[in-house]
Amino acid sequence: MIISLLGYMGSGKSHVSKNLSKKLNFPLIDLDQKISEENLLSIAEIFQTKGEIFFRKEEKRVLENILNEEKDIILSLGGGTPVYYNNMDLINEKSTSIFLRASVKTLTERVLLQKNTRPLIAKLNDDDVPEFIAKHLFERNPFYSKSHFTVDTDSKTANDISAEIIKLLKI
C-alpha cells in the first residue's frame, strides 16, 4: 500500500509522514527530496536555474516512477503536486491519498515560524501571509478535496494524526 500525504505547506506533511513511517514500518519517500537528489540541486536551485516548468515536468516524472515502482511506502508530496498535469488522478489511482487539512490561521502560524525556509512566502510581509495562503487554498482545494480521505490537523500532534490515519485505513 502506498499512502500519499498531501496538503498545503504547514499542514503537517513532513512531521506526519515521518511519524507514520515509524509507526507502520514503511519507508518514507519525500517527493521534493527525491527530485532534488535526482537532479543534484535543491528545489530552490532547480526553480532558479531551470524554472518552474522544468520542475513540474520532473515532479511528474519522479512521481510516476515512484507510484509505478514502489509499494508499502509513505509518500510525502509537495503542496503543489496535485494541481499540475493529471497528478491527482494518478495519485488516487496508484495510492491511498490523504489530505492533511488545516485552517488558514493554523497554516499561517506554522509557516511564519519557518518563513525564511519557505520560498513562496519568504519575501512577503507577515501581515500579507494569511491572504496569500487563503488565495492559494482557494485555488488548490478542488484538487486536495479529491483525496480518498481528509484529516484535520488543527491542534493535533503528528502522533494523533498518524493514529487517526491508521484507524481510517484499518491497518
Language model feature labels by segment:
Residues K23, F138-I171:
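NTP-dependent small-molecule kinase module
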Residues S14:
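Walker A/P-loop
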Residues K94-E139:
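A glycine- and Lys/Arg-enriched "phosphate-lid" helix/loop adjacent to the NTP-binding pocket
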Residues L5:
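Hydrophobic anchor at the beta1->P-loop junction of P-loop NTPases
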Residues Y8:
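P-loop (Walker A) phosphate-binding loop of NTP-binding proteins
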Residues Q33-N92, T117:
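ATP-dependent small-molecule kinase phosphotransfer cores
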Residues S11:
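ATP-binding Walker
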